[in-house]
Amino acid sequence: VELEWCALMSSSFEKETGIKVNMVRKSTGEVLAQLNAEKANPKTDVWFGGTGDPHLQAAEQDLTLPLQSPQTPKLQDWAQGLARASGNKATAVYLGPLGLAYNPEVLAKKKLAPPKCWKDLAKPEYKGEIQNSNPNSSGTAYTGIVTFVQLFGEDAAFDYMKAVHR
């Protein structure tokens, strides 16, 4: 989630309620680990942002509480779906695409064609050129793995990721 969004929400909430907000930006994995660590003595009031799967994990582990908002029926169907799937312990606030990004200048210098699809990344010419975040801490990187499993099937997805890693 963009820092600007968080700053605006924090300042607006403080202005409206008089309650001081201590906003901390962390990766999805860090927040989930923190909620697990705090389970016996919770310190976190609101978890805003992150990808859907960790929110569902937190809901299943009773790390979050249900909130039946009267605004839920006004949300997009996909956001309402996450609320239902989590027992109203999570609500989707944004939908972000997962895509490839590359530096055309670097590709031109190395005489590489731009990748056109995920499977292109496993080609030998891209060896050593691919970067990705750690899916243990990055919700987006984790979503990438889930996406590959959905696209290719589980075994083929992990074979693909091994090929990219080589």
What are the residue ranges of the model-derived segments?
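Extracytoplasmic ligand-binding site segments that recognize negatively charged/polar headgroups
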Residues: 2-7, 26-30, 42-166
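Short alpha-helix C-terminal cap/hinge motif
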Residues: 8-22
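A short local structural element in Rossmann-fold oxidoreductases
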Residues: 10, 36, 59
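Short, well-structured alpha-helical segments in soluble
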Residues: 33-40
